[in-house]
């Protein structure tokens, strides 16, 4: 399949703070027949929103480098930053990463803001840093090593596989599936089924118009105001509180 690379608009670098060098880049890819965006990113924050008025995918990237002179920071960014977006068939592929130098480690990150057209599904493979997705229309698939994940005001199914870090999901029209190693999970105002597999950490699920399934090893579980059935498999160590369930409640050891 033909691989089309899109050019990068480079804005002037600036010194945000006395010890932080910041450089801003913007990437634009016409959406056309694209129905899926795949994001591979390393250290840094990630914010995604649906921009219904746009017919292209727009990426704003802030590259931050700590404790280097402006000249050294520019040289580091030029040599070690990988930032590009390509079109392959009906998919857009975004890569945002930093090469790590172990002999002389540098504290650096790439913070991303991504605007996508309505109906474009997003698949995320993230290293570390907070992820915030809101006012989004499309399906989401998130694979994350660590960091806070916030998903709110979404129309579409959401799937999250997380190593560690807090997960917040609120006001979603679609089914939810979460697989979490450690960290608390908060799920609120969902119109769809919820399925959670958790290693450790508190789980709070409330106001769900659908069925709820939880598989848990340890940590407190609070479930309330559910219109469908609730199934708890292998409740581990931790308090279990279940209230105001319209369907059946089943616990399996």
Regions found by a protein language model. Give the residues of each.
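Positively charged n-region of N-terminal signal peptides that target proteins for export
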Residues: 1-7
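Low-complexity, intrinsically disordered short segments enriched for Gly/Pro and polybasic residues
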Residues: 1, 17-20
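Bacterial N-terminal signal peptides
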Residues: 7-16
């Amino acid at each position: 399949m033909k691989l089309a690379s899109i050019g990068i608009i480079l804005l002037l670098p600036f010194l945000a703070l006395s010890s932080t060098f910041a450089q801003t880049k913007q990437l634009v890819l016409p959406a056309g027949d694209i129905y899926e965006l795949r994001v591979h990113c390393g250290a840094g924050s990630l914010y995604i929103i649906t921009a219904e008025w746009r017919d292209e995918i727009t990426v704003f990237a802030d590259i931050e480098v700590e404790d280097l002179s402006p000249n050294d920071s520019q040289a580091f960014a030029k040599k070690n930053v990988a930032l590009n977006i390509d079109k392959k068939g009906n998919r857009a592929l975004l890569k945002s990463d930093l090469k790590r130098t172990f002999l002389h480690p540098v504290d650096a990150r790439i913070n991303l803001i991504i605007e996508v057209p309505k109906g474009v599904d997003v698949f995320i493979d993230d290293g570390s840093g907070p992820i915030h997705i809101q006012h989004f229309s499309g399906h989401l698939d998130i694979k994350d090593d660590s960091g806070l994940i916030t998903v709110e005001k979404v129309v579409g199914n959401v799937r999250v596989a997380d190593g560690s870090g807090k997960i917040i999901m609120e006001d979603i029209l679609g089914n939810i599936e979460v697989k979490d190693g450690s960290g608390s999970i908060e799920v609120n105002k969902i119109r769809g089924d919820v399925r959670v597999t958790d290693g450790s950490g508190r789980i709070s699920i409330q106001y769900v118009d659908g069925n709820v399934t939880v598989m848990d090893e340890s940590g407190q579980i609070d479930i309330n105001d559910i219109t469908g059935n609730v199934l708890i498999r292998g409740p581990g160590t931790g308090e279990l509180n279940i209230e105001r369930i319209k369907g059946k409640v089943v616990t399996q050891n």
